[in-house]
């Protein structure tokens, strides 16, 4: 897939070195956690209340686009509660026994983090229901007429589920979460603080305007901001004095073909296809997928969310439509053959 080559993709697989760096700069407490003020305030109250009662925190669902800190927040929850974190992902839990092994190894009030929880198989998901509600594990012993069910008591624990596709969760599973938090794209100010903090932890010399320039091109996503910081660091070492200032950041990011609003070649290709090939739309997902030679899931989950959030495209019942902002960004003339309704939509 094309998106795996994108430096600004929050889904891009990371190298071992990058994972080590990310763990080193990852905030450990809510006090270090920048951005998401509503989430931070709520979680601080919920965690303090649970600790005062000496209870496990309510099961927590965290959802939002990739790279916004769902895994980071799960680690913070465990750290703030003073308990262990056991981590896995939906696709890894293929059999009921896989989940049973994890659950039976939990200590009191521990946190079990399941990433991509929407990808749990139905068999595994059914095991979770009594575990979440009653802290009990139902296991079938034997087969056929001799089969019998036994119940194993579990210690109180907190399940933290993370997903980019909250709509794919079944209602019975979603309803069992006592706390549901949505992570939003970060503001430029919050991202610049994250970039500045990461630079200091990596012993990099960075100016305020250098951090701000990286933040502006990071698509509201901390994972992308930290990745761009590492690439700008490389550029500063080779082409500059090692100091990350505005000029160095601008030159490095331009070399990486990340434009001033954070768009890369894939965003440009998507928007130009929509505006030049299809006169601004409306265009259906199947048509865009064929025109771009890209998977529908990648278009919906990776390319479009930021474009929609920033107001460059609209999803309507008839398909995707380029907005006036998109035409202005590329300095393109709005086609004369657009319908009156579409002209009105573009002007909103």
UniProtKB/Swiss-Prot annotation:
Subcellular compartments: Cytoplasm
GO biological process terms on file: DNA recombination; DNA repair
InterPro entries: AAA+_ATPase, AAA_lid_4, DNA_helicase_Holl-junc_RuvB, P-loop_NTPase, RuvB-like_N, RuvB_C, WH-like_DNA-bd_sf, WH_DNA-bd_sf
Residues at which Mg(2+) binds: 71
Region named Small ATPAse domain (RuvB-S): 187-257
Pfam families per UniProt: AAA_lid_4, RuvB_C, RuvB_N
Major subcellular site: cytoplasm
EC number: 3.6.4.-
Region (Head domain (RuvB-H)): 260-348
Entry keywords, A to Z: ATP-binding, Cytoplasm, DNA damage, DNA recombination, DNA repair, DNA-binding, Hydrolase, Nucleotide-binding
UniProt xrefs under SUPFAM superfamilies: P-loop containing nucleoside triphosphate hydrolases, Winged helix' DNA-binding domain
Annotated stretches, region: Large ATPase domain (RuvB-L): 4-186
List of residues binding ATP: 25-26, 67, 70-72, 133-135, 176, 186, 223
UniProt note: domains: Has 3 domains, the large (RuvB-L) and small ATPase (RuvB-S) domains and the C-terminal head (RuvB-H) domain. The head domain binds DNA, while the ATPase domains jointly bind ATP, ADP or are empty depending on the state of the subunit in the translocation cycle. During a single DNA translocation step the structure of each domain remains the same, but their relative positions change.
NCBIfam families: PRK00080.1 (NF000868), ruvB (TIGR00635)
Subunit structure: Homohexamer. Forms an RuvA(8)-RuvB(12)-Holliday junction (HJ) complex. HJ DNA is sandwiched between 2 RuvA tetramers; dsDNA enters through RuvA and exits via RuvB. An RuvB hexamer assembles on each DNA strand where it exits the tetramer. Each RuvB hexamer is contacted by two RuvA subunits (via domain III) on 2 adjacent RuvB subunits; this complex drives branch migration. In the full resolvosome a probable DNA-RuvA(4)-RuvB(12)-RuvC(2) complex forms which resolves the HJ.
Family according to the record: Belongs to the RuvB family.
Purpose of the protein: The RuvA-RuvB-RuvC complex processes Holliday junction (HJ) DNA during genetic recombination and DNA repair, while the RuvA-RuvB complex plays an important role in the rescue of blocked DNA replication forks via replication fork reversal (RFR). RuvA specifically binds to HJ cruciform DNA, conferring on it an open structure. The RuvB hexamer acts as an ATP-dependent pump, pulling dsDNA into and through the RuvAB complex. RuvB forms 2 homohexamers on either side of HJ DNA bound by 1 or 2 RuvA tetramers; 4 subunits per hexamer contact DNA at a time.
Protein name: Holliday junction branch migration complex subunit RuvB
Organism: Francisella tularensis subsp. holarctica (strain LVS)
């Amino acid at each position: 897939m094309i998106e795996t080559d994108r430096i600004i993709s929050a889904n891009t697989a990371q190298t071992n070195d990058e994972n080590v760096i990310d763990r080193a700069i990852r905030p450990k407490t809510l006090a270090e956690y920048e951005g998401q003020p509503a989430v931070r305030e709520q979680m601080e109250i919920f965690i303090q209340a649970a600790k005062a009662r000496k209870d496990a925190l309510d099961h927590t669902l965290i959802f939002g686009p990739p790279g916004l800190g769902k895994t980071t927040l799960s680690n913070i929850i465990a750290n703030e509660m003073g308990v262990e974190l056991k981590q896995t992902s939906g696709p890894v839990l293929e059999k009921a026994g896989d989940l049973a092994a994890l659950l039976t190894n939990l200590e009191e009030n521990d946190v079990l983090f399941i990433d991509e929880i929407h990808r749990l198989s139905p068999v595994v998901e059914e095991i979770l229901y009594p575990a979440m509600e009653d802290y009990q594990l139902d296991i079938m012993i034997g087969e056929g007429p001799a089969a019998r069910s036994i119940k194993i008591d579990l210690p109180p624990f907190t399940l933290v589920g993370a997903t980019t596709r909250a709509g794919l969760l079944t209602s019975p599973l979603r309803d069992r979460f006592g706390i549901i938090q949505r992570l939003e794209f970060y503001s430029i100010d919050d991202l610049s603080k994250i970039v500045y903090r990461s630079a200091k932890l990596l012993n990099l010399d960075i100016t305020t305007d250098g951090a701000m320039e990286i933040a502006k091109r990071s698509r509201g996503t901390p994972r992308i901001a930290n990745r761009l910081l590492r690439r700008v660091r490389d550029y500063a070492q080779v082409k500059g004095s090692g100091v990350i200032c505005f000029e160095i950041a601008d030159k490095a990011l331009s070399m990486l073909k990340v434009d001033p609003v954070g768009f890369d070649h894939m965003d440009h290709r998507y928007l130009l296809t929509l505006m030049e090939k299809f006169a601004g739309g409306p265009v259906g997902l199947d048509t865009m997928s064929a025109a771009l030679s890209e998977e529908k899931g990648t278009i919906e989950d990776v390319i479009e969310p930021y474009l929609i959030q920033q107001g460059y495209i609209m999803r309507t019942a008839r398909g995707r439509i380029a907005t006036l902002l998109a035409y202005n960004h590329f300095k393109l003339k709005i086609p004369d053959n657009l319908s009156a309704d579409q002209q009105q939509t573009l002007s909103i």
